[in-house]
């Protein structure tokens, strides 16, 4: 029994194979998507937790209200203590007065939540696996051929890949042509490989990788890039 279970544990899922597409519907070879990234079981609760934390961290948290001690004015007693028949008052900046301070109002705070890196990575892999199972991940050799940006070319190419509306385009930071080509396209979000996150994957209908960006995401930065960053 132990030998059988050990054999099953050592068995690995086969990598997914996708065609590398070019404009006009042509294919330029294939590329493998590692099963440990693009074919894992999606944990919905984990993805929800990670996305919630990401959106919370994006909040500015600069909201603020003034208490009666912070509102300008109100130093003088509005009327005498006794003899008026009215309730005694010490300041016109008390909460019950118009223009007075706020009680228990919002104050600046940090909404960020601590999320372990392993959880963030697992949630991202689950989101990518969900898109891969539904044929919503595409790999292209380059979004626009040449060095001249073209919004029209990029738009037509994305329309060939899918008839769905929202695209997450993962391209290398050095691919200026691709960044400029999709900058003005509605419902198309360009992103660098090291910025890929669970929320953006789930918020898009299709994820499009350039070959360069896919390699950078799967294998990490190259040695040359690491030397430049030092």
Swiss-Prot record:
Superkingdom assignment: Bacteria
- Show the GO cellular component annotation of the record: ribonucleoprotein complex; ribosome
Does this entry carry the keyword Chaperone? no
User: One biological process GO term for this chain?
Assistant: translation
Which UniProt keywords are listed? Ribonucleoprotein, Ribosomal protein, RNA-binding, rRNA-binding
Output the Gene Ontology terms for molecular function.
rRNA binding; structural constituent of ribosome
Matches recorded under Gene3D superfamilies: 3.40.1370.10
Any Pfam family from its record, for instance, is Ribosomal_L4
User: Region Disordered: which residues?
Assistant: 59-113
Membership in a protein family: Belongs to the universal ribosomal protein uL4 family.
Function, as annotated: One of the primary rRNA binding proteins, this protein initially binds near the 5'-end of the 23S rRNA. It is important during the early stages of 50S assembly. It makes multiple contacts with different domains of the 23S rRNA in the assembled 50S subunit and ribosome. Forms part of the polypeptide exit tunnel.
How does it associate, per the subunit comment? Part of the 50S ribosomal subunit.
The name this protein goes by in its record: Large ribosomal subunit protein uL4
Name the species this protein comes from: Nocardia farcinica (strain IFM 10152)
Q: Which gene encodes it?
A: rplD
């Amino acid at each position: 029994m132990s030998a059988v279970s050990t054999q099953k544990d050592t068995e690995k899922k086969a990598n997914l194979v996708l065609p590398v597409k070019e404009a006009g519907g042509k294919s330029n070879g294939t590329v493998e998507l590692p099963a440990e990234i693009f074919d894992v079981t999606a944990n919905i609760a984990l993805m929800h937790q990670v996305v919630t934390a990401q959106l919370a961290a994006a909040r500015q948290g600069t909201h603020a209200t003034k208490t009666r001690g912070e509102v300008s004015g109100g130093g003088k007693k509005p009327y005498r203590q006794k003899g008026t028949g009215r309730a005694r008052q010490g300041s016109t900046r008390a909460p019950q007065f118009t223009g007075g301070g706020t009680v228990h109002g919002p104050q600046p705070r940090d909404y960020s939540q601590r999320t372990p890196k392993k959880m963030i990575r697992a949630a991202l892999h689950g989101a990518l696996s969900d898109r891969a199972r539904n044929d919503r991940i595409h790999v292209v050799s380059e979004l626009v051929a040449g060095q001249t940006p073209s919004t029209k070319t990029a738009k037509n190419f994305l329309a060939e890949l899918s008839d769905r509306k929202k695209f997450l385009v993962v391209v290398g930071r050095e691919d200026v042509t691709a960044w400029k080509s999709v900058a003005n396209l509605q419902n198309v979000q360009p992103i660098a490989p090291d910025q890929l996150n669970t929320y953006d994957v789930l918020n898009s209908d299709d994820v499009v990788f350039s070959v360069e960006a896919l390699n950078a995401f799967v294998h990490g930065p190259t040695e040359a890039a690491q030397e430049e960053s030092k």
